[in-house]
């Protein structure tokens, strides 16, 4: 059994600004069933699905540096790379682990290990912080027969990520 005094946590309780509710929201974002969506009054177990919906974001795979350094004109970015030792940077990072990036409607940019598929980290841009409480929807049914609970999509990190290596001479 869980903490039955908190079993009825709701959106209004996270909006009251109590420190425990703010921590609960953070733990909810990390996958904890803080709002008891499965109805077992255990607010510490892991939700079955906690990645936000991916509607508009393309998946981006980033691995070893692959920017071109062959050029035909000194007005090309490749010219700058070729004349500033990009090839050393690229060879230094040739074994960089492949990572999958995708934006989701939970307000986060997610990074996944390409080989294992597990989440490595997620980033919440500062402009999304005020929107996070809007994820909680205690009236949304997720199964049949359903306990109440689910999440609303919050748009803001649902665009496609882009990749560009940042190469600065003297910094590896």
Range-by-range predicted roles:
Residues 1-172:
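A fold-level detector for beta-propeller and closely related beta-sheet-rich head/sensor domains
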């Amino acid at each position: 059994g869980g903490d039955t005094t908190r079993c009825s946590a709701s959106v209004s309780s996270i909006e009251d600004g109590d420190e425990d509710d703010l921590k609960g929201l953070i733990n909810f974002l990390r996958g904890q069933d803080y709002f008891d969506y499965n109805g077992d009054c255990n607010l510490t177990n892991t939700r079955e699905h906690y990645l936000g919906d991916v509607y508009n974001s393309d998946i981006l795979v980033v691995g070893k540096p692959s920017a071109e350094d062959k050029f035909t004109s000194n007005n090309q970015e490749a010219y700058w790379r070729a004349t500033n030792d990009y090839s050393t940077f690229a060879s230094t990072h040739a074994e960089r682990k492949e990572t999958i990036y995708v934006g989701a409607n939970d307000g986060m940019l997610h990074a996944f290990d390409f080989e294992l598929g597990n989440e490595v980290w997620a980033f919440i841009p500062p402009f999304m912080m005020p929107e996070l409480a809007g994820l909680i929807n205690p009236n949304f049914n997720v199964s049949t027969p359903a306990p109440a609970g689910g999440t609303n999509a919050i748009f803001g990190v649902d665009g496609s990520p882009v990749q560009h290596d940042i190469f600065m001479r003297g910094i590896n």
